């Protein structure tokens, strides 16, 4: 009887200990790594007992949240932005890790003709021939800002003004292509890698392509210090590289 009572007491102590040591980790991220985190976060939670809460938004909105003092334990965004926050003292440099590089893909509705986008000139012709094109809003995401510049560079900004729909992938932009409401979509490869109803034509051609290096780091004042750092380290671990690759990210430095 004593042994049973002792076992119950020990089990209760272990549960209490785990609940005390477990942390809730709040992660703010742009939309590009969302598919990766959906696959890897449950594995991290199972292995560590920690809970991860994600806040996804376009990068300009994330900047606004940070400026307003919204509390967060980990930031995931393009590395140049992380570097800026490290210099400002808002992120811990020793926790920073790179996750991978994501290119920018052109997509059409599944079964639709695939335009030739092999060169800048052919991409330009494909844009002009399209009934409608959707990409993220310039100024709000790296790909949206880039596409605004590309339209100017190709001299078709005015011609495309009435054709272009500005909608981030997080707000259903890719789905407009799947539903046939837009002929062409242009988004980070990771945001179109596993979407049903669309087909990837290819990446933007040389001269107007965009590759964005993503990484993560813990905030300087996070109360979940070790747990938050463990999350970043886990996501950058070599054994998880295949998940990043399947979701459209190439290894850092590739």
Which residues are covered by each model-predicted region?
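Bacterial N-terminal signal peptides that target proteins for export
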Residues: 1-8
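Cleavable N-terminal signal peptides
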Residues: 9-10, 20
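Extracytoplasmic catalytic/substrate-binding loops of multi-pass membrane glycan-assembly enzymes
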Residues: 13
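N-terminal signal peptide c-region/cleavage motif recognized by signal peptidases
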Residues: 16-18
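Exported/periplasmic ABC-transporter solute-binding proteins
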Residues: 22-60, 64-71, 79-102, 108-254
């Amino acid at each position: 009887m004593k042994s049973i009572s002792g076992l119950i007491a020990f089990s209760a102590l272990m549960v209490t200990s785990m609940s005390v040591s477990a942390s809730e980790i709040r992660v703010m991220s742009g939309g590009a790594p969302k598919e990766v985190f959906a696959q890897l976060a449950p594995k991290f939670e199972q292995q560590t007992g920690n809970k991860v809460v994600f806040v996804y938004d376009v990068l300009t909105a994330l900047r606004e949240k940070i400026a307003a003092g919204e509390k967060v334990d980990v930031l995931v965004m393009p590395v140049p932005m992380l570097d800026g926050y490290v210099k400002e003292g808002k992120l811990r440099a020793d926790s920073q890790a790179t996750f991978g590089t994501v290119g920018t893909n052109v997509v059409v509705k599944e079964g639709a003709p695939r335009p030739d986008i092999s060169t800048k000139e052919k991409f330009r012709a494909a844009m002009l021939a399209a009934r409608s094109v959707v990409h993220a809003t310039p100024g709000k995401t790296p790909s949206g800002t880039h596409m605004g510049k590309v339209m100017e560079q190709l001299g078709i900004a005015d011609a495309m003004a009435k054709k272009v729909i500005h909608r981030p992938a997080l707000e259903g932009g890719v789905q407009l292509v799947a539903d046939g409401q837009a002929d062409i979509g242009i988004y980070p490869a990771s945001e179109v890698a596993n979407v049903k109803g669309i087909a990837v034509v290819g990446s933007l051609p040389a001269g107007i392509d965009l590759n964005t290096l993503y990484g993560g780091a813990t905030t300087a004042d996070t109360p979940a210090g070790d747990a938050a750092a463990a999350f970043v380290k886990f996501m950058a671990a070599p054994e998880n590289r295949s998940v990043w690759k399947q979701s459209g990210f190439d290894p850092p430095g590739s």
